[in-house]
Amino acid sequence: MDSSHQSNYKLSKTEKKFLRKQIKARHTLLRHEGIETVSYATQSLVVANGGLGNGVSRNQLLPVLEKCGLVDALLMPPNKPYSFARYKTTEESKRAYVTLNGKEVVDDLGQKIILYLNFVEKAQWKELRPQALPPGLMVVEEIISSEEEKMLLESVDWTEDTDNQNSQKSLKHRRVKHFGYEFHYENNNVDKDKPLPGGLPDICDSFLEKWLREGYIKHKPDQMTINQYEPGQGIPAHIDTHSAFEDEIVSLSLGSEIVMDFKHPDGTAVPVMLPRRSLLVMTGESRYLWTHGITCRKFDTVQASENHKSGIITSDVGDLTLSKRGLRTSFTFRKVRQTPCNCSYPLVCDSQRKETPPSFPESDEEASRLEQEYVHQVYEEIAGHFSSTRHTPWPHIVEFLKALPSGSIVADIGCGNGKYLGVNKELYMVGCDRSQNLVDICRERQFQAFVCDALAVPVRSGSCDACISIAVIHHFATAERRVAALQEIVRLLRPGGKALIYVWAMEQEYNKQKSKYLKGNRNSQGKKEEMNSDTSVQRSLVEQMPDMGSRDSASSVPRINDSQEGGCNSRQVSNSKLPIHVNRTSFYSQDMLVPWHLKGNPDKGKPVEPFGPIGSQDPSPVFHRYYHVFREGELEALCRTVSDVRILQSYYDQGNWCVILQKA
């Protein structure tokens, strides 16, 4: 029903419900995606809930739309819960608006979805993707015949005795078998002193000899891993350890096609189609610098045209659809390296780092030790330099503090150099920080501050009218400790008290806008480098989040454990090493170490540059701070686990996710 006609007669209960849903879809599209709808009829429509991100394929949606007229174009952006349709005439689009609004369709998983249509001025979408494969990457189609594929698949006995854990394992994400050497997923490496008996299967010899002759590989592999993936399974993004294997790594895809995601440290992402019976060859930059992984999902976004079988999935949204995954088996071949790696990518090379980064924490005790070394000690060392970069308060934080009633008692948990303690002279503000040196700077500025841990603040329960926690919670190394930090903040609040929380966002490009962190001067530094600009742009999110149990919304916000559904965990393989982030680039891991180049002559000793590349000409000591960057919706999901609190508002502010909470 057209909302412009609602005043002509009294709406029924069903019509009112539909109208609310349609308006909600319209507002969500505007807030989340910047898509503005219009109240008058045009040739173009945006179809909320009719997108590849909802599990609706081109083959499903197009026939539904064509019942109302000739569809000139159907644009389906990847991973989005909506699409754009342009009809030949405005009359046809009006017919679709009236006929299809509120229509129920069934997605590829058999779930019911309700479509909501709104007019837009133009059906358009621009998304630039690289038109070339990562350097050193090659996909060779039909490298083997269907008969050879059948022979290889039948040679794998998944029912054999699994007591020998050196050769076969059933992982959470997939089934694996190892030959030559066991591949250890906790460190993406092999034990070179413990080869497996039997070597590689004889059936592989003829294929390997052929690939050697044809130049696809330079070394005959002596290690092979067979992975079997059910639909919906995958493998986290990773780089095979440099020191473990020689340059080329090749993978043969059997049984089903798959889309593998490659990502450069600068954020460039390239989805690559690996057809059935194709050989993926990774050498050079694609092997050493780019991460590769398979996203856990049952459908891949692929080209709809028949002539596109392998290579990059382009950004032509007029030629994208969904492809249902099948049972895929991969044979991955590697040559074990016997000497240190001397590649051209020392920042990500384990052979060329002076020290080894720490592993992901597996317990609260390990997390505490990690925070002590890579958060607390670092800020003690860099406090002076850090404070010199912290001067201008952020506008939306100032707005929150100035809106509080005069005389309010406010605690700044993790106050740093006290940048916010003097913003509103009408408040009684007190700060606390884990760093003694930063607290001393606060006191030099005549602010009230003391040293404590954010998990145990020595302040009476219910004594604060408000709290702020700016760029602190992302330094806690486990979800449980992050929740505990939130609970401690809520404990301090009186009933009705409010808290403002900022954390660093995984999405440093949002609504097609890069954050100041990505655009900023690469030579500048800051404690929370995500918070180093004098201006900010706030992007409000939906304050009343849609019901996650319903597919009847234009978009949704993930719950805290969404990323773990289907056997995939957002964190990388347990015990794997924390990656070191390249400053001023997009994130490819949620948990990482972020470098800080200490400028000037530090008073305290001469700290050694940890994990720095051999031959580095930078005389500045480099420290590394632990961060967990938050995905969209993760902070809200974390807050929902805390009792006696509700979310008043959530928004995006220059590379940070932010919430305002109120205690019940």
UniProtKB/Swiss-Prot annotation:
Sites binding Zn(2+) sit at 242, 341, 343, 349
The protein's name in its UniProt record: tRNA (carboxymethyluridine(34)-5-O)-methyltransferase ALKBH8
User: Boundaries of each Fe2OG dioxygenase domain copy?
Assistant: 220-337
Describe the family membership recorded for this protein in Swiss-Prot or TrEMBL.
Belongs to the alkB family.
Keywords from UniProt, A to Z, are:
Cytoplasm, Iron, Metal-binding, Methyltransferase, Multifunctional enzyme, Nucleus, RNA-binding, S-adenosyl-L-methionine, Transferase, Zinc
Q: Give the coiled coil ranges.
A: none
In this chain the RRM domain maps to 43-120
What processes in GO biological process is this protein linked to? DNA damage response; tRNA methylation; tRNA wobble uridine modification
Q: List its EC numbers.
A: 2.1.1.229
Superkingdom of origin: Eukaryota
Keyword Transmembrane helix carried by entry: no
Q: Where in the cell is it found?
A: Cytoplasm; Nucleus
Organism expressing this protein natively: Macaca fascicularis (Crab-eating macaque)
Cofactor binding note: Binds 1 Fe(2+) ion per subunit.
Annotated region (Methyltransferase domain), positions in chain = 411-664
Of the GO CC terms on this record, one is: nucleus
Looking at its record, which EC class is this enzyme?
transferase
